[in-house]
Amino acid sequence: MYSKLMFFFALCSISFLFTSEAASTMLLESSYLPLNQSYAPGFLYKRDMLPPPLQAVLTYTCPEPRPLAEESYNDLLRAISQKSSSDFQNAYSLALSFSSDFYQHGLKTLKDVSFLAVEKFLWGLTRLWSSLILASFSALWWLVSNFTTPVFCLALLYTVTKYMVKTVSFLFGGLPIWIISIAFSLLKKSFSALRSTPKCLYEKAIDGFKSFTIPQSPPKSCVIPITHASGNHAGYASCIKLYNGENALMTATHVLRDCPNAVAVSAKGLKTRIPLAEFKTIAKSDKGDVTLLRGPPNWEGLLGCKAANVITAANLAKCKASIYSFDRDGWVSSYAEIVGSEGTDVMVLSHTEGGHSGSPYFNGKTILGVHSGASATGNYNLMAPIPSLPGLTSPTYVFETTAPQGRVFAQEDIAEIEGLYAQVMKRVQQAEDFKPKTGKYWGDMEDDEDIFFESKEDLSGKRSARHRPRNKRRRQLHPKDKQRRWERDDGENNLISSGKDKSREHREESDRGDLRESDENSEIPPQKSPKETAGEFERYFSSLYNWEVPTSPREVPGFRHCGKLPQYYHPKQKEESSWGKTLVGNHPALGEKTSGFGWPKFGPEAELKSLRLQASRWLERAQSAEIPSDAERERVIQKTADVYHPCQTNGPAATRGGTLTWNNFMIDFKQAVFSLEFDAGIELPYIAYGKPTHRGWVEDQKLLPILAQLTFFRLQKMLEVNFEDMGPEELVRNGLCDPIRLFVKGEPHKQAKLDEGRYRLIMSVSLVDQLVARVLFQNQNKREIALWRAIPSKPGFGLSTDEQVLDFVESLARQVGTTTTEVVANWKNYLTPTDCSGFDWSVADWMLHDDMIVRNRLTIDLNPATERLRSCWLRCISNSVLCLSDGTLLAQIHPGVQKSGSYNTSSSNSRIRVMAAFHTGAIWAMAMGDDALESNPADLAAYKKLGFKVEVSGQLEFCSHIFRAPDLALPVNENKMIYKLIYGYNPGSGNAEVVSNYLAACFSVLNELRHDPASVELLYSWLVDPVLPQKIPGE
């Protein structure tokens, strides 16, 4: 029986193995069965692999299933095991599903319970904490109310202990780390400074700037050489007056930094040497590069110097200057010019050499600043301005006189400069209450240089106390006070006087001034401000226009009749003077020289006739002219900007920072006003006020502020009004510009022009338009004049002396790369002299636009406000309203034409002439107006395409002079000058002023002819000798 059970168990096991193997085989092979194969019972239990499927379609017929009783035990066991496995899998899946649902439900319940528990815990903690705080405050209040004194004592002890612990912690923990970090930071900054590109070089010669050096000592011997301890030269310093009664030594900071053992040396033959270590710092700035030092007692006497006055940055003006240096032959003075600002530095045109640092720039006897170095990128030197330190470099109770030509720095730049000396300003405020030990300033005592005046009333009876004028007086300390101040000065604390220590006399003057002003205000009603008055002037001038077009308008090609102004100009016809007729009658050879010339016609009819003739020729040339492509124009614009690069300048101060402000505008306005030609005509419509010249407005204290307001109003309108689509009349009616007066120039004309009626017309702009142009362009134009040797434009040179002629020829020789003798003798091998006929009328609108692009590219700090103002100015000058002498207004239809009386005419004409040469293929060119010298060959056909009528001269001719030698240039218009001389004056009238003017003109003409002694002698006998015997009153 036992053996049967064992056999049955073994049989079941083997059957189970076979079943598992067959099932696995079926699972592996079932994926390879054809899709159309039918399932047959017993197929899963076959162990042999199925044969490859046939290509043909097979049809199987399933047999009827056999009864279970006919199956073998193996098949039955396999079926039982498969059934068991299937049931087990189903039960397992069901159990797994139930378990998953139970887990998810349990997890959700646990999460909800946890959130609830945390919330209850936090609220419980909040209640506990608030209860503790409430209990603490209650306990603290109970302690304070019942034990007040002990509690406050404990609080005080706790505070003291806390800060003691912090102090000890800082001393033994934070302080060493702080010292190490500071040292590391200094090393890092030093390394960065050594690696970085310097902002300025120490010395530089300015390209194109002509300076001169003359033997001259500094004012008051106030410039002091600084040397190394070894005696080698290191730089310069200067002795200046301070407003606290002291004298200070001023030098450049980098001189002291580079020379730690510097010594001040007397330059007056004395052997005194004072180490600068004996001096103590008053004010210092590394970035500002100015250091003020307080010296030991009587240091000025030991060095043999006196103190000079200074101008601070707030009042620094663009002006002429001089800089002093000491060479082996003594002191010399070099010419310089203050031209603008660069950040907190001042741009200076000057020639300097090694060792000039620290030397002051002077205007007259006043120090303007300290030489700092040269710009690393720009064509100019840099001067460190003197900061305005109340009580030191500027007064605390009076205002310094405003610089006559406007300030160099805008208000924001001045604030930045003063910020460099913030520590000094702080010490100034702390020392305002200083009073000398004696109780009285030495300046309030008698001074050797004071001059006193006495009236007759002072001579009778008791003599009254003498009072001296107190204007701009600086108090001087007694030498003992100076010594005590120097001895107790640690180099940081500076004793500075303030307004509280004002002298009694000055306080009395101030009080009387306030009282007098109060009296005036009580008697005289308030006057209108200049702004209000300027508004009334604008309305008055606008009322003069009549914009109604007459029924029979005057027709001019390129212009339309648009209105009328009252007639203010009545030009008189010039006639040949009786003096000239007498001279020609006595000297027939003089008549031969002056034949072929005559005076033109004057008046509106002559103006209209000439205008029609020239305008028709202008339109004819303009129609045949071709405008270059955009690429060609850009090429010439960039090339022009490159050759004019030495004349890069700052834009107007008026729009610095992108905004037009009154204070900055006044900087430019003052400079513009003082550079005007005072005797020039004021033009339309301002002539209606009855003052015909600039002088009448500029020198009138009441009209000058109004003129400033009128100019400022115009600039504001140019910024605010949409001018882009306005015509000439609209520009005038909207107050963006004034009409341009047209008149015939009062100079002799050739007979051919007189017969044709082609007179030379002048288009003169108004005073306000002049000022607007000067505000926008004066920096650039003046820089071009100063640096004419470095750029193609030559408006700044002259040919009145042999030295000037040689100077120009040397510049020309450098341009062509040869010697002066060679370029004059064989000029055809190097250049072509050309002249353009009717140049002003040939200037097209696109040429003016390209010239403005070059101007903008040469402006360092160009901003949208400056660009818009210049664009509006260009729109107005290209689309003008001309006014004849009888008041007829003619609006320009086609834009263009250079206006001969504009402030920019000389500068722009020269540059446009150079650009025209570049358009025709010239490699280089130099021009003065319409005259030009350019590289070979000149392409006249290309000029004609541009609309110019250009002719080549057969001689080396430039600016109406023919060059015969490097220092010899003969005028071309000799006969024209003589005609104007003899027929334009009438010294026979006996008027002293007429005779004086005639003789001055004679000597000017004779100077032009100086290289022909025989001609000069002959003309002298003809023109001068008959006048000399006359007695001229006042001589």
UniProtKB/Swiss-Prot annotation:
A single BP term in Gene Ontology: proteolysis
PROSITE patterns: PEPTIDASE_S39 (PS51868), RDRP_SSRNA_POS (PS50507)
Catalytic residue positions: 254, 289, 357
Residue ranges occupied by any RdRp catalytic domain in the UniProt entry: 829-944
Domain of life where this protein originates: Viruses
Reactions catalysed: RNA(n) + a ribonucleoside 5'-triphosphate = RNA(n+1) + diphosphate
Disulfide bonding pattern of the chain: none
GO cellular component, one term: membrane
Bias type Basic residues, positions: 463-477
Modification comment: Specific enzymatic cleavages in vivo yield mature proteins. The protease probably cleaves itself and releases the RdRp (Potential). Cleavages have been shown in the P1 protein, but since the N-terminus containing the serine protease is shared between P1 and P1-P2, cleavages should also occur within the P1-P2 protein.
Signal peptide positions on this chain: 1-22
UniProt GO molecular function: nucleotide binding; RNA binding; RNA-directed RNA polymerase activity; serine-type endopeptidase activity
Compositional bias of kind Basic and acidic residues: 478-488, 499-519
Alphabetized SUPFAM superfamilies for the sequence: DNA/RNA polymerases, Trypsin-like serine proteases
InterPro entries, alphabetized: DNA/RNA_pol_sf (IPR043502), Peptidase_S1_PA (IPR009003), Peptidase_S1_PA_chymotrypsin (IPR043504), Peptidase_S39B_luteovirus (IPR000382), RNA-dir_pol_luteovirus (IPR001795), RNA-dir_pol_PSvirus (IPR007094)
Record domain Peptidase S39: where: 206-400
Pfam families: Peptidase_S39 (PF02122), RdRP_4 (PF02123)
Disordered as annotated region, ranges: 455-534
Keywords: Hydrolase, Membrane, Multifunctional enzyme, Nucleotide-binding, Nucleotidyltransferase, Protease, RNA-directed RNA polymerase, Serine protease, Signal, Transferase, Transmembrane, Transmembrane helix, Viral RNA replication
EC numbers for this chain: 3.4.21.-, 2.7.7.48
Role, per record: Precursor from which the RNA-dependent RNA polymerase (RdRp) is probably released. RNA-dependent RNA polymerase plays an essential role in virus replication (Potential).
UniProt-recorded name of the protein: Protein P1-P2
